[in-house]
Amino acid sequence: MVALLGAGAISLVFTLFLTPLFIKLFHRLQWGQFIRDDGPQSHHTKRGTATMGGIVIILASVIGYFAGHLLTWDGIRFDPVTPSGLLVVFMMVGLGFVGFLDDYLKTRKQQSLGLGGWQKIAGQVIVATVFAVLAITLRDPVSGLTPASTAISLFRDLPLDFMALGAVIGTGLFIVWICLIVASASNGVNVADGLDGLAAGASIFSIGSYVIIGFWQFNQSCDSVSSYQNEYRCYEVASPLDLAIIAASIVGALIGFLWWNTSPAQIFMGDTGSLGLGGALAALAILSRTELLLVFIGGLFVIVAGSVVLQRAYFKITKGKRIFLMSPLHHHFELKGWAEVTVVVRFWIIAGLLVAAGVGTFYLEWITQ
């Protein structure tokens, strides 16, 4: 508990008080946001706002995570970091680096296109593939479990194990499955990062849910004396408490960052932040074995990304007609006359309700066993 609270508090203090220094640094480096001409006209005033704030979020999250563990020092030892926690860090940093390359090219060229679409996907696939291999290779030093399972999961593992098809085919399909989850989550957060504070606030709800889920799984783990030793009620998850700790560190970093990112934003997270956060969200879902629950927990990102897919598909099928005034969905409501802050707060409410539904069904599954 000390590590969990400490990680969140340290990362929050880091972003809350040090973000202004990074804003000045980014302006000096000329890392300013480029605004597309075909976007909402009201966004043109944001041109030049410091971007790549994801660097601050990721740095604070990593520092908070390790510092939280150091706080458990009792004069002899401290609670060590685990493969599960380090894998979340790896995913966040890895996809954050892909986003950084995209952001850097945008600021250098002063155009909306940094990395090409397929280049960005390739980066996500490389990071996700390494993550997938490590997640079924490494072992938790206490429980002996691998951080991830090769089975598809909802509230826990379902009887749908890729390895039932054989080691080679099963491993290949598992890697494809992980790449699909990672690409969907990271691009979902990326698409939602279009209004001041929208992605940061929604991510607080989504990633914050894994503080609750991880802590609950820790208390009800199959090797815990507090569990009923019932295979249908306990959770076989490697290091769930450490997943809660890294989730708390990310949430703390986001809360402090949101202070400066709320409208009118003084800094944007950029693709560095949105891809990194989406990667962390995917990693938390995979390692806590709640992958399909992401439909609820990341529900807002599903809706926003879905609006883009729907708009493009309808445009092609009807040869030029549109469902929305503009996609992603938040821009549609802006063009309908909603104030930016109104759109953001209402989307936060939707995100919160969907997360509550996800966590609620997670708990409901346990009490009905």
From Swiss-Prot:
<feature type="transmembrane region" description="Helical">
    <location>
        <begin position="118"/>
        <end position="138"/>
    </location>
</feature>
<dbReference type="InterPro" id="IPR018480">
    <property type="entry name" value="PNAcMuramoyl-5peptid_Trfase_CS"/>
</dbReference>
<keyword id="KW-0479">Metal-binding</keyword>
<dbReference type="GO" id="GO:0008963">
    <property type="term" value="F:phospho-N-acetylmuramoyl-pentapeptide-transferase activity"/>
</dbReference>
<feature type="transmembrane region" description="Helical">
    <location>
        <begin position="290"/>
        <end position="310"/>
    </location>
</feature>
<dbReference type="GO" id="GO:0046872">
    <property type="term" value="F:metal ion binding"/>
</dbReference>
<keyword id="KW-0133">Cell shape</keyword>
<keyword id="KW-0961">Cell wall biogenesis/degradation</keyword>
<feature type="transmembrane region" description="Helical">
    <location>
        <begin position="347"/>
        <end position="367"/>
    </location>
</feature>
<keyword id="KW-0472">Membrane</keyword>
<dbReference type="Pfam" id="PF00953">
    <property type="entry name" value="Glycos_transf_4"/>
</dbReference>
<feature type="transmembrane region" description="Helical">
    <location>
        <begin position="240"/>
        <end position="260"/>
    </location>
</feature>
<dbReference type="GO" id="GO:0051301">
    <property type="term" value="P:cell division"/>
</dbReference>
<dbReference type="InterPro" id="IPR003524">
    <property type="entry name" value="PNAcMuramoyl-5peptid_Trfase"/>
</dbReference>
<keyword id="KW-0812">Transmembrane</keyword>
<comment type="function">
    <text>Catalyzes the initial step of the lipid cycle reactions in the biosynthesis of the cell wall peptidoglycan: transfers peptidoglycan precursor phospho-MurNAc-pentapeptide from UDP-MurNAc-pentapeptide onto the lipid carrier undecaprenyl phosphate, yielding undecaprenyl-pyrophosphoryl-MurNAc-pentapeptide, known as lipid I.</text>
</comment>
<comment type="pathway">
    <text>Cell wall biogenesis; peptidoglycan biosynthesis.</text>
</comment>
<dbReference type="GO" id="GO:0071555">
    <property type="term" value="P:cell wall organization"/>
</dbReference>
<keyword id="KW-1133">Transmembrane helix</keyword>
<protein>
    <recommendedName>
        <fullName>Phospho-N-acetylmuramoyl-pentapeptide-transferase</fullName>
        <ecNumber>2.7.8.13</ecNumber>
    </recommendedName>
</protein>
<keyword id="KW-0460">Magnesium</keyword>
<feature type="transmembrane region" description="Helical">
    <location>
        <begin position="198"/>
        <end position="218"/>
    </location>
</feature>
<keyword id="KW-0808">Transferase</keyword>
<dbReference type="GO" id="GO:0005886">
    <property type="term" value="C:plasma membrane"/>
</dbReference>
<comment type="similarity">
    <text>Belongs to the glycosyltransferase 4 family. MraY subfamily.</text>
</comment>
<dbReference type="InterPro" id="IPR000715">
    <property type="entry name" value="Glycosyl_transferase_4"/>
</dbReference>
<feature type="transmembrane region" description="Helical">
    <location>
        <begin position="267"/>
        <end position="287"/>
    </location>
</feature>
<feature type="transmembrane region" description="Helical">
    <location>
        <begin position="3"/>
        <end position="23"/>
    </location>
</feature>
<keyword id="KW-1003">Cell membrane</keyword>
<keyword id="KW-0132">Cell division</keyword>
<feature type="transmembrane region" description="Helical">
    <location>
        <begin position="81"/>
        <end position="101"/>
    </location>
</feature>
<feature type="transmembrane region" description="Helical">
    <location>
        <begin position="162"/>
        <end position="182"/>
    </location>
</feature>
<keyword id="KW-0573">Peptidoglycan synthesis</keyword>
<dbReference type="GO" id="GO:0051992">
    <property type="term" value="F:UDP-N-acetylmuramoyl-L-alanyl-D-glutamyl-meso-2,6-diaminopimelyl-D-alanyl-D-alanine:undecaprenyl-phosphate transferase activity"/>
</dbReference>
<dbReference type="GO" id="GO:0008360">
    <property type="term" value="P:regulation of cell shape"/>
</dbReference>
<keyword id="KW-0131">Cell cycle</keyword>
<dbReference type="GO" id="GO:0009252">
    <property type="term" value="P:peptidoglycan biosynthetic process"/>
</dbReference>
<feature type="transmembrane region" description="Helical">
    <location>
        <begin position="53"/>
        <end position="73"/>
    </location>
</feature>
